Curated annotation (Swiss-Prot):
Type I interferon cytokine that plays a key role in the innate immune response to infection, developing tumors and other inflammatory stimuli. Signals via binding to high-affinity (IFNAR2) and low-affinity (IFNAR1) heterodimeric receptor, activating the canonical Jak-STAT signaling pathway resulting in transcriptional activation or repression of interferon-regulated genes that encode the effectors of the interferon response, such as antiviral proteins, regulators of cell proliferation and differentiation, and immunoregulatory proteins. Monomer. This is Interferon beta. The gene is IFNB1. Pfam families: Interferon (PF00143). Its main location: secreted.
Length: 187
C-alpha cells in the first residue's frame, strides 16, 4: 500500500525533469539546424576571406566563458546562445552597403537569426521563467562588450568592406561557439 501511495509522488518529481529533458533535446535539434544554416549563409555572402584584408584582422577577445562551454548548465547555455544571436542580429543590421554582399542573403541571414531569437525567448519563458541570475548577467555583459569591440572596429574603419569581412569571419567564430554551446543542450 505504501508503494502505491508513493508512486504519484515520485512521478510528480520525475515528470517535470523528463519533460524538460525532452524540451532541451528538441531545442538542441532546432538550434543545431539553424546554426548550420547561419554558417552556410555567412559563407554564401562572399566565400573566402580576401587576402588583401588580412592586415586588418583583429583579436576581439572572445569572452573566456565562451571558450569553455562545458562549464555551462543547460539554461545558462541557452541564455548565452540567445545573447550571442541578439548581438549578431544587432551588428548585421548596420550599414553594410560597402560590402557588395547580396542583400537577399543578408536579409535571409537576419531573418533566420531573428526567428531563432524569438524561438529561444519562448523556450526560456515557458520552460524556465527566464530568471536573470548573476551568472547570466555576467555572461551577458561579457558578450555585449565583445560585440561592442566589434562595432567600434567597424565604426573606426567607416564600415569598409574589409572591416565587414573581418566581422563576418568573427561572426563565423561566434557561430562555432554557439554550436559548442548547443551541444551542451543535448546532455
Amino acid at each position: 500500500m505504501t508503494s502505491r501511495s508513493l508512486l504519484p509522488f515520485v512521478l510528480s518529481l520525475l515528470l517535470p525533469r523528463i519533460i524538460m529533458a525532452q524540451s532541451y533535446l528538441e531545442l538542441y535539434s532546432h538550434q543545431w539546424l539553424n546554426n548550420w544554416k547561419s554558417l552556410h549563409l555567412l559563407n554564401e555572402l562572399d566565400g573566402q576571406f580576401p587576402l588583401h584584408c588580412l592586415k586588418e584582422s583583429m583579436n576581439f577577445k572572445l569572452p573566456a566563458e565562451m571558450l569553455h562551454p562545458h562549464q555551462f548548465q543547460q539554461e545558462n547555455a541557452t541564455e548565452a546562445i540567445h545573447d550571442l544571436l541578439q548581438q549578431i542580429f544587432n551588428i548585421f543590421s548596420r550599414n553594410h552597403s560597402q560590402t557588395g554582399w547580396d542583400e537577399a542573403i543578408v536579409e535571409k541571414f537576419l531573418h533566420g537569426v531573428h526567428q531563432e531569437m524569438v524561438w529561444l525567448e519562448l523556450f526560456l519563458e515557458e520552460e524556465m521563467g527566464w530568471e536573470n541570475s548573476t551568472l547570466r548577467r555576467d555572461i551577458s555583459l561579457h558578450i555585449k562588450s565583445y560585440f561592442k569591440r566589434m562595432m567600434d572596429y567597424l565604426k573606426g574603419r567607416n564600415y569598409s568592406s574589409c572591416a565587414w569581412e573581418v566581422i563576418r569571419m568573427e561572426t563565423k567564430r561566434s557561430c562555432l561557439v554557439i554550436y559548442r554551446l548547443t551541444r551542451k543542450l543535448k546532455k
